[in-house]
Each structure stands twice: as C-alpha cells, then as structure tokens.
Amino acid sequence: MCALAWVAVAPSSVTAANRSVPVDPVQVARDYVQRHSQDLGLAPSDIAELAVSSVVSSRDNGVTHVYLQQRFAGIEVDGGIINVNVLKDGGVISAGNRFVANIAADAEDQAVGQTAVEAAYAAAEHLSLVPTEPFQILARSDGPDQATTLSSGGIATGPIEAKLLWLPTSDTVRLVWRLVIEEIGGEHWWNAFLDAGTGTFLGQDDMVAHDTRDAIAAGIARPDGGNDGNDDDDDRGDDGRKGAAYRVFPLPMESPSDGPRRLVRDPANRQASPFGWHDTDGVRGPEFTITRGNNVHAYTDVDANNVPDAGSSPDGGTQLRFDFPLDLRQPPAKYQPAAVTNLFYWNNIMHDVAYRYGFDESAGNFQVNNYGRGGVGNDDVRAEAQDGSGRNNANFGTPVDGFRPRMQMFEWRSSAPNPITVHAPSPIAGTYFGPMAGFGASLGTTGPITGTVVLVNDGVPPTSDGCQPFTVPAGSIPLIDRGLCLFVIKVKNAQNAGAATAIVANNVPGAPFAMGGVDQTILIPSVMISQADGSLFKANLPLTGTIADGTGGNPDRDSDLDSGVIAHEYTHGISNRLTGGPATVACLNNAEQMGEGWSDWFALALTARSSDRRTTPRGIGTYVIFQPPNGDGIRPTPYTTNMAVNPSTYASVADVAISQPHGIGYVWATMLWEMYWNLVDHHGFSRDIYKDWKAGGNNLAIQLVMDGMKFQPCRPGFVDGRNAILQADVALTGGKNACDIWRAFAKRGLGVDASQGSSNNRFDGVQNFNVPQSCLHDRDDDDDHDCDDDSAGGIGTLDDNDCDDDNGHEVAGTGATISAVTIRQVFVNGARIRETSPPR
C-alpha cells in the first residue's frame, strides 16, 4: 500500500549544482521528490499536492530537515510524510518515504456520509465515554478537510477538533473523520478514526505515553537503605553561585537512593533559557516567583481535574529560593513543595540539555516565548505532581507544536509483598508473595478477603489469560495468567464477573511485582504471584486462601523525586516532536516504534557518572518500586552490555513475552546503550553534559541519537532508526564513528543484513550479526576494547568459544561472519533503497 523506503546516498555524490547560489532546502526537497518519484514508487498524482509541514534546521551538522505532507483532493494522508535531509551545500544525504502509492485508485468513489457531530457520538461510544451535554459546532472551515471545532460534550478537557483525513490501511486507504479528544483527567489524549462514509470506528491512537509496569517483567521489590530526606537543616551542598536556588536531587542524581539533596543555584543554561527559568517576556527579571516560567509550569493535581491545586506551585519569593523540607518517612502529601520543586527543576534540565543537542524552537520544543528563534510558542509543559488520576504510573501527552503538553506524575504504592495464605489443600498450605496492584482498591481498605481460588476460562485460547469476559462461581477468587492484554483488562473482567479480588500469575520466571495500569472504574484489589507459585496453585485446585494487606504501612513513593522517570516521560515529548517533524505527532504509533527505548536511554544517559562502566547494571525506576539503585528496575533486565545479564537482541522484538511498546523499547534502548559505551570507550566521558559533542563519547552519543530522530522516517522500525544514526554520524563527523555504531547494533542482531520487514509488524523482522568488512580492521585502540565489542553478537569472524564476555567468562560462538557488502540496492514495493557504508 505505502511505498516504504529509506533512500540514502553518500554526501559527496549529491551536491548542489551551483554553490554560489543560496541553497533553498525546501526547493531542494521538492525537486528531489520530483526527480526520484519513480525510485520511491510514486505516481504523479501521489505527489501533485504535497505540502511543506515542517522545516527543522540543526546547528551542529548544518542539515535542514524538510518534512513534506502528502495530500489528495485537498485532504491530508495520515502519516503520509516524506522527510528529506538536506546538507548545507544543497546535497541530499537521505530521504524517508511514507507516502501512499497510487492513492488515486484507492480514494475514488469515497464520499462523506457522516457529520463531525455524528462521528463524535460514535467515537464517544467506542471509547466508553458518556457525553453529559450535546456536541455543538463552535467553528467549521469550508476547506476540503471540513475542519471542525466541537464543544467538549462533557467528555473532554476542552474543545474537540475534527477533520477529514485519508487513513492508510494494510491494503487500501479510507476517508475518515479524525477527532482529537483529551479525556477529562488527562489519562488519554485520543486520535479517534471513524469511517467518514459509514461512521464505523476504525481505530485510535493515544498521544499519552505511559510509564506503567503493566506487562513488564521485573525483580522483586525490596527495601533499600537510601536517604530519608532529612537534609534541609542547613545549606550543605550549596554550590556557592548566586541567583535562583533549588534544593533538589540535581543532575546527575537519580533519586533519594543516591543521597541527600543539594541546594543548586542558577542552574539555567544561558543558551537554552537566556532569561532564566522564571521568565516569559524576554526581558531581564522573572515574571513568576513560583514554579512556573518559560519552559514548564509545575504544580500538584491531587484531585485529577487537570487544573493546578490552589497554591500548589511553591513560591520562592523575590530571591527565588526554593528550599523546602523533605521527610521520606512521611506520605508524599506531607512534602508537596519539595516534590514540585524537584519536578520543576528536572523539567527545566531536560529542556536545557535537549536544547543543547538540537531540540530547539525550530524543532518544536516546549516554550511559552520562543524569543524570535522560530517554531511555535505557547506550549510549555504542564507538569502535574502527585496526580490523583492513577498510581504506579507516569505519562506524557504530546500534541503538535504550539499546543501545551502534559506530564502526569503519580505516587507509587508500596510493592512489599502482601501475604496470600493458602489454607487448603494442606500440602501447599502456607504464605506466598503477592504484591498489590497499583490500581483498584487497597487491601488495607477492604480488609482480608477469603475464598476458593479457581482458574478462569474465557473461552478463547489461551483460555486462562482473562482477556475476554468470563464467569466464576460466587465468592471465588479468580486465578488469571499474565499475557496478551493489559492487567486492567484482566482485573476489570474479574470485577465484572462479581469477584471481590483477583490473582494474576506471572508468565515468565522471576519474582512478582505491583501491576500497573489506569482504570478508575476498577474497585477491587488484585495481586500478582510468581510463575512458579502460579503453577503450584494450578496443580492443586481448588484451593482456599486469604489475601490480606501486607505493606506494613510503608508510605507511598513519589515519582516526582525520581529523575529517571521524569527524564523518561519528557523524552516522549522529544521523540514525538522530532520524528516526522513538529507539525505531526502521529509518527510513533506503529508496532515497531522505539519511543519507550529513547525514553529509557535518555534517562540512563542523563544520570550516568564517570565511575560507571559498561557492565554496571542500570535499572529504570528502581526508587519508585522500592528497589536499591542496583535493582533490576521496571524492565525485563537492567541495562548493561553484559549479554549474560541482558541477552536481548533484535529477535526479542517478536517474543510475545516482551510487551508492546515497553518491551520493544527495552530492546532498542539496549542497542543504544551498546553504542553509548562504544563511543565512551573510544572518546572518553565528559562530566559537562552541556559541552558540545566533541567533549566526550557520552555527549557524542546524545547528539547522534537526537539527530537520528530527525533523520528517520515517520513510523520508523529498528533498521530505520539504525540507518538514521549512521546518517547522522556522516553529517556530523563524516562517518568517523561508523564502525563503533555498526558493532553496537550488530552485537544485538541489527547487523547489515538484518531485515526489518514492515515497521507496522513486530513479528516479521530477521536479525543478523554482520558488520561491514571495513569495520574488521579499523580499530585504533583494540587494547581498550574487550570481547564485549567483538563477540556475543557476531562482530568479526569468530570461531566457537574463542573469546570472553564482560565478566571474563567464555562465550559460545555465534558462527558470525563479516559482510563484504558496502553498497547494496534492493527494491521495496518498487522503491529503490541504496544503502551506503559511510566513508571513513
């Protein structure tokens, strides 16, 4: 259906015809598409109405990224974007194509048979939203897309935007109404698609990315010996500078587990935030003395109405001193000013660091005032601390440039195991671990629940996963297997069956954990048990047992104090604005998209220290799940280049035990972490993250990952993302780091002959461990690289058992080979793809 192509050329082979004439990147991009339309598999009618949606210029490499939107009959094609990456001299280094080929044939005879109002009612019904007032038309255009603004109908936080789009499917294109609905509470920000002719609901995208533990394997939560937060009796940690002061867990600290807070002064970066963090008018002097400014407004939203709680933005006074007490032995409600201050600080840090590496005004960053530097303003982040709409979660909703994103940070319930007591049969009588879910009622509120445990059968294989409605005997406790659908779906089905509680059995080895998810209609408690305990229970059914509260009164933990979680969520905004350009946020809704991976990786990169090593285990979210800093975190394994600890490869993407999108992102972040360490080993580590990419391998890695998101096509897969980083290195350094990059990806199965298949399908990729032949003998510093760089993933020609892993243990060989291919051309849906090994 779509001509999915990545076209790459060596920069020396495509240059401007006349370098004395100023380069117009937009015209270069238009001309490129016209000249290469046949290579792209596109008919004249496919490109006849293309429009410029965004133009993003990158300072460090001089590349201008031009994003062209496909239209037909005056109506945009959803995700139909060609991105053309133009060098300073007018050369085209690469182009990514997501236009629909031969659209005229599929679009003919489709007509509008439903109004925007009718579509709104149909969308509400499908999304289980109940309008409390009629939908009214507030504005309507006379253009072909019939863009319409509707009243909220009581289901949205504000007006609902609707317009006609062409929606590509697997084999055709449909004329649809797209409605943008931000649900009250902010848990979901839907793009809903309904057939414009029939009103049939065709699908939805959620612009809110969630960081729940739902469908993720992790180690058991355990108490740590971290800081209790009593660090506010003096100015220890004061960095001595003048200006605004914030007592926080500063860069690169991750959480209270790393030690006491410090009072940092004047941390704003002068390039990114030239008038400080409390300015909005571009004139020296703050407009706000609260936790609000050009980049973010931080506050609490305990009542979950998406409006700041009264007085919840701490006031630093005329001196802008934000120094508030923190006692972690108390519940989060007792230290709100300290939590909001930390959230404000880290949102600004993310803004300023990302700005340094290219997420600036023209790229669609988040600012009220763009200070005349391009882009669309009035879109600072609304950072909501201790949001009351959920638990054990965090999220970030990203609209297009010019509309304010929303970050929601939640409290995390203690995951200390709740005792499940089995009374009978006697051979297995005893107490079992069962951490309570982060959604639904608390066992501390309901009290102990006793019943007969029965295995569910929902009638659809695998019948015990509870993903379909089921029935259970009155008074029983349903036992449900993990897998295939969200935890909240399983528990909601149990509630609908009349159960007072539910037990979910893990489907992978390891300890149980506190399940995450958001569904405020779930009113029963639920717990998880391990796979081993689940097998034991199932072998001894029916059994009787009691589930009771076992948290021991531990206070909840506040994700506002975990900078890794904050950085993860903020990066969702970065990746959504950079991929496909800031005028669209519909480019990371495909099955193989890597959004969760970039978010994990930035959390790792910003909290890395010079004492870290490539084999140092790094868990994500360890603080909020009551683990020590070296805990496994909320992913299947901690991040490390040690294959014995983190064995994920490209083939893992197709493993149904790996969740979508978090598990897929975990695989991508693992690959990026390999690249990060190859570059750090080669170029060293810079303690100053604001220095340019030449200062250290960590800075270089951030620059390449950020640039790669601009280079890659809309709706990328893993191969697209790898190629984009290679092209970014060509533009930045002439390809000098190509082999470090190739080795990283090839070690994890994304070598030169890896096949992505469709980026809309996570199951059709083929891994490969080959690198270009030019990368076999190019090392200048072989003594600085251990076997981790050239084995256990197929770097070089290896015999079995011929090298050691990161811990000095022998690694089984992989039979890897070296690819002699440096340039190869293949055809995908009629589009030629030229892959070039970057020059060295």
Where are these regions (language model features)?
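Bacterial N-terminal signal peptides
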Residues: 1-9
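Segments that shape or occlude catalytic/ligand-binding pockets
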Residues: 12-229, 238-256, 324-328, 353-412
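Second-shell loop/turn segments in exported
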Residues: 17-22, 71-73, 103-113, 166, ...
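Zinc-dependent metallohydrolase catalytic domains
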Residues: 143-147, 289-292, 300, 333-336, ...
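Secretory-pathway-linked proteins and extracytosolic
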Residues: 184-348, 634-636
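Ser/Thr/Gly/Pro-rich low-complexity, disordered linker/stalk segments of secreted
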Residues: 223-238, 777-817
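Structured lumen-facing ectodomains of secretory-pathway proteins
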Residues: 415-555, 576
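Short, solvent-exposed loop/edge segments of extracellular or virion-exposed proteins
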Residues: 424-436, 797-798, 819-835
